[in-house]
Amino acid sequence: MTGMKLFKVLAATAALVVTAGVAVSEPYDDGQSKGYYDVLKGKKVAFVPLSMGFDLTEGWNAGLQNQAKALGYTVDVRDPNWNVEAGVQAANGFIADKPDVLILHALDQQAYNRIVPKAMSEGINVVQINMKSVTNGDAFVGTDWYEMGYKQAEEIVKACGKDSGKNGKVAIITGQASTPTTVIGNMAFDDVFAQNPEIQIVAKQAADFDPAKAQAITSTILKQNPDLCGLLGVWDGQDTGTAVADI
């Protein structure tokens, strides 16, 4: 093979490699995912947490913002700071803005009962997370509070019930009274303890999801009941206060 022929072969091979490289570098399309991602571009998501400033909601927002940046949609957050009325106002304000998706994290089980259908009637997709209103939206992503409460109560029965050799004295530190966590969790507690009458509830008080308040309440309960067998809480953020209570 002459030098000129060799050059032509190498040039042709190089062209094929370059062409192949261009073809391979095209985004892979499985016929479904690309269309899904394309639909998200330019969409508006509105988020009303019960409050910002603690790990749970900050983590959710960080995840939303990261994905929004990657997929081309926007996330707007309005923080009611543990105030139910402020949450309702924020949600109504978002409905007027007509986002594509409204994400609600309900502090009060009843507060968004009108908000949810109102948003849906405007064509807004409503997603409720972790704590939902009585009225269902398009989707709920979160904890089954009845199941969790039931399992918690069963564990207390194992630790303090008739087969434990203990006295059965238990105290319950709940969150805010109108939250799904408390309302539904209490139903589960009652159902389990009804089947285990040896469990004696010596105190049930709300600490409003405040660790300092939980600490003070627990200290009082322990002083009044020094032989207490068990304490049942509803949220680890609040329970950090319970755990350091003084006797």
Language model features with spans:
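A residue-level marker of the well-folded mature domains of exported/periplasmic proteins
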Residues: 2-11, 21-247
